[in-house]
Amino acid sequence: MPLELATADIGPTRHRQHNYYAPDKFFIRDETGRLMNRYRQRVMLVPEDFIVSYQLALEEEVGDAAAEIMYRCGYEWGKADIRGFEKRFEEEFGRKMSEAHSQMALETWWWPLQAAGWGAWSYDFSQLKDGLIFVDLFDSAVAKSVGNIGKVVCHYYAGMFAAAFGHIARNELSGLEIQCYSMGEEFCKFLLGSSKRINAAQFWAREGATAKEIIARL
C-alpha cells in the first residue's frame, strides 16, 4: 500500500506535506476502528495514570531489573522503528536515508513521535570525535507522568535513542539517562556511546555523580 500524504499548492507547484500536523490528518482510524498515525503505525491514547501504573507494576514485579527490561524494550522498539523509517524515508523522499543529511533524517524520524506526545528533543554532536552523543529531551511522556521521585525513569528513551543513532551511524551504541525531569531537573539528558563508556558512566551515576560530573570524567 503506497504512502499517502496530504499535499498543498505553493505557487504553481503541488508539494507533499511532510512534517505537517493536524489532528484529523495525523491520527486516523482504519476500517476496524484501530487508531493509526499517517504513516500507518499503530498508536494508543492513554492517560498519565496508565504510564505511572505500568512503570510501578513492573518495578514491583522485578525490582531493580525493571530499568534494564525497560531499556531493552526501548532498544528493540527503536531498532524496529528506525528500520521501518528507513524504508518509509525512501518512499516519501525518493532517496535512500543514507544519502540524506544525518540531521535531516533524525528530525524526520523523531517528528511523528513528538507529534504523538513523546516530547521534543535536541541532540549534540560536539563530542562525536570522542565517540559521544548527547540528547536532551523536553516533556518526556514518562517523566512528566511519574513526576519528581528522585531518580531517572526514562529507560525506554535511552534504549530507543541508542538503537536509532546506532543504526544511522552503522555502529552499535549503548545509552544511559544521566539527568531526568523526575529528579527535579528541567529536562532529561541522555548519553550515547560505546558500551565501555556507558558502563563507566553508569557506575559513576550509581555512585551519585551528577550529569556535569559524568561528562567531565568522560
Across the structure, where does each feature detected by a protein language model lie?
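N-terminal accessory segment detector
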Residues: 1-134, 139-156, 174-218
